């Protein structure tokens, strides 16, 4: 009797299992065709880097050395009748510290904001016997030129393909030595605004406008950003007309660059005016140069990289002017000339991962 019950229950369970399997095989999945996802699609944003690009420098400590050159300081007369003589002086070398920091304070998919500071000094070692009768040569010999400032960069991706990039800096430029406090009238403000496209992870392109002093005086110029990695070895990194580089990647820890950079600023000569009791109220040195260069950058330990740069400094402008009047057609107080030396710069850099 028990065996009959067990056999009957086995037949029932087997029938239910077979029926269930057939039901699964014959189920009409078309009923799910119109089901929609309830979640909102995640929006993607482009990044500020390209694949294969050079690592971003967070902190840099450097030393700049320029070889022998000759400065010809033209004579000039002051409004009250004073006259300052023409003088030609040999410079044995220029040297100075280069320090930079650019630290991200906000870094997420929607915003990247960095705050930074910079210091660049140029000391003048004139040949022995230099008279320094011309006020410009005298202040360069005594004080040199110094730039120190603060800056910020904001990268705002709009979507996966477009972005806005803004930069702003406030620099104090003048004939003051390192350790001396600059004054308010030595402040210069620069800024840039670009709109860009990132079509692939290996290419960025942007156009915009910049207020800059790289040409030695206040200028408003169009600018172009173009960063592209062509293959595993070659690429370009440009922000025209300020700088441009062809990049060759030896491996992930060694890179070579060939290119140029336009360097310059307008320096308020407060010490020169004070020492010579000048009747001019706003004498400035309009300094600008083009540096054609080769650079080798390599990792020395983890994220610490060394950069060795060598090239030729081409003087573009070294004139003295009174006041800062954008678009002014008045003549320079003195149109000076400066010959072109070779130069070398070495920097130790902490780079981003």
Residues of each region from the PLM?
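Short sequence motifs at beta-strands and strand-loop junctions characteristic
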Residues: 87-95, 140-146, 183-187, 216-218, ...
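Outer-envelope beta-barrel architecture signal
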Residues: 53-59, 109-115, 160-166, 201-205, ...
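Hydrophobic, lipid-facing positions within transmembrane beta-strands of outer-membrane proteins
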Residues: 57, 93-99, 146-152, 172, ...
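Transmembrane beta-strands of outer-membrane beta-barrel pores
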Residues: 63-69, 117-125, 170-176, 209-215, ...
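Outer-membrane beta-barrel "beta-signal"
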Residues: 224-227, 296-302, 306, 337-353
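Cleavable N-terminal export/targeting peptides
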Residues: 1-53, 352-353
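Transmembrane beta-barrel domains of bacterial outer-membrane proteins
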Residues: 27-163, 167-180, 188
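Residue-level signature of outer-membrane beta-barrel architecture
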Residues: 101-105, 152-156, 197, 228, ...
